[in-house]
């Protein structure tokens, strides 16, 4: 008797040659839309083309076709990423001082760009040490390359060429999986199989191969580099892999091979799979052996996780069952129906992924400085500041994107007729309570957090320092944060007896790591100043959430516009004759949310930049005396608004303002130019559409008089187009201004 699995053994999951490959459509801009394909009557056409080119929902209602387009576009995105990476590695190979930096990372700055000397631009190539003139880079690539065991510019060349090959492979895959073998909808909806492959394959085998590389290549090469061996003398990576004796000289347990593994005598491997905690005093980075251990552990977890979901064999978890079982006494139907939402609405799926990835990115920002993973990263202050700022901005944008796609899901994909009394429906039914409470929280946080600052400014102005909230007068110590710090500082002796140091030196415990006379990391003291600014963080984040959540919960309907769902995701007003209904679309909430996201992240990166310069970064004398860059002025200066303006913004802007005539002058120009871009945005944000239409008609009249009128009729931007252009320039200008301000400052003083 034969027992067959209920599933057929082979599922045909692709369609062959579904879409003919043809370049004819490339010559027809807007081929995806009947109206746009007709060509331009007015200048609005070019804006509509940009708005809808990637909105696959508007091209077709067929979910399978939309899925294939998204899938194919992902390969295009990967191709661009590989191309960008290839460019980075090529710059390292062709234009950088990587080999010089590798031999003396404490005295030589990383540089991978040399500006050609056209009309006196020689000034931009500053002296980064070791006789090399170029632009100091702050991307952290040098530190990553050293950690991964790259010892020569030839290796960077080879990697750059490899990345180019991968880029072309990805381009090919994008074409192949749309035109030649396109997956069926069922393949995109097979979530258990997807989970197994992504968890076990991408994360599990990915981490395992990285752990293998770190153990067999990175660790031995970094051992030699730390010992001061000339990079040219170090054996090449493949020699360590092929010749076990080489490794056994550095790590004696390698001679025993896999025996300790199978005899469960795992402690033998502790010399290269360590559990130390803290930082390597030579490089100021995490112990590479700790990192290898971490990736091995992660790999095992994800390899197990990748075998948990039910596919062809009828055992394991089914996601639908898990979601439908997920209900409590107060949650009605719970997550019933969520499985159907997430397998038919890619906006809902994307929204969740963006929210999680955005939060993770912000967590990464905080770990990059508190647990610096790469050698000589912690003492490269410019790179530390850049990495923190970069990851904070990216995280902020991703979280706003999560709200945007949640709202698009609500408008386009949500079906209220089939959803009753599940969690989403229950949230929507008491959305008034949620939003009004959240609004109260925002008002409370706003008045109280700013109230503390205004109190301090007033007392300071009246010469009454004894009545201020500060560490030396009325203390508002962050006792809960300090408790968390102490808990973690004490953990090695209690919850993690194998570790010699806590996870991060920032927790406390008095230990300091300095590399080449510069502070890598030390315990970060928290006081009244941090308590104040943390409540500003709470305020700005809650307002951002209020705006975005209101946009999602009221995306389909509101008391003001009950039929909002019929108007779509973005619309200017609810038609003529209904005053006071403009700027209520879900799109407008995303637009407003972006400004508050910008507020939130700006305060965070300002706080970080000043706090680190004041209390962490600096030099250490032979006697062990630490001199911080701004001499610890954060605790007393940042407790007033005036202090932020005077001692942070103004005092630290002197480097960028005075950069003309120096190798930092490009930052001075960017500072000026980005201010201009930012100011340009206000023209779009503060003026109405009719104003521009009147102006345009005057100008068209003049063109007609001169008989040079264009065939395409000029039109003012629509309300939404104008706001989109405005917010784009506002954010671009603001972020680039901050970038120039930060880098000119930290490169000059760091």
From Swiss-Prot:
PROSITE patterns according to UniProt: PHOTOSYSTEM_I_PSAAB
Binding site for chlorophyll a': 675
Chain residues that bind chlorophyll a: 683, 691
The entry's keywords: 4Fe-4S, Chlorophyll, Chloroplast, Chromophore, Electron transport, Iron, Iron-sulfur, Magnesium, Membrane, Metal-binding, Oxidoreductase, Photosynthesis, Photosystem I, Plastid, Thylakoid, Transmembrane, Transmembrane helix, Transport
Binding site for phylloquinone: 692
Membrane-crossing segments per the record: 70-93, 156-179, 195-219, 291-309, 346-369, 385-411, 433-455, 531-549, 589-610, 664-686, 724-744
Pfam families named among the record's database cross-references: PsaA_PsaB (PF00223)
Reactions listed under catalytic activity: reduced [plastocyanin] + hnu + oxidized [2Fe-2S]-[ferredoxin] = oxidized [plastocyanin] + reduced [2Fe-2S]-[ferredoxin]
Cofactor info, note text: P700 is a chlorophyll a/chlorophyll a' dimer, A0 is one or more chlorophyll a, A1 is one or both phylloquinones and FX is a shared 4Fe-4S iron-sulfur center.
EC code: 1.97.1.12
Xref: InterPro entries: PSI_PsaA, PSI_PsaA/B, PSI_PsaA/B_CS, PSI_PsaA/B_sf
UniProt GO BP: photosynthesis
Subcellular location: Plastid, Chloroplast thylakoid membrane
Claim: Chloroplast is one of the keywords in the record: yes
Role summary: PsaA and PsaB bind P700, the primary electron donor of photosystem I (PSI), as well as the electron acceptors A0, A1 and FX. PSI is a plastocyanin-ferredoxin oxidoreductase, converting photonic excitation into a charge separation, which transfers an electron from the donor P700 chlorophyll pair to the spectroscopically characterized acceptors A0, A1, FX, FA and FB in turn. Oxidized P700 is reduced on the lumenal side of the thylakoid membrane by plastocyanin.
Protein family per UniProt: Belongs to the PsaA/PsaB family.
Name this polypeptide is given: Photosystem I P700 chlorophyll a apoprotein A1
Organism the protein comes from: Oryza sativa subsp. indica
Gene (name only): psaA
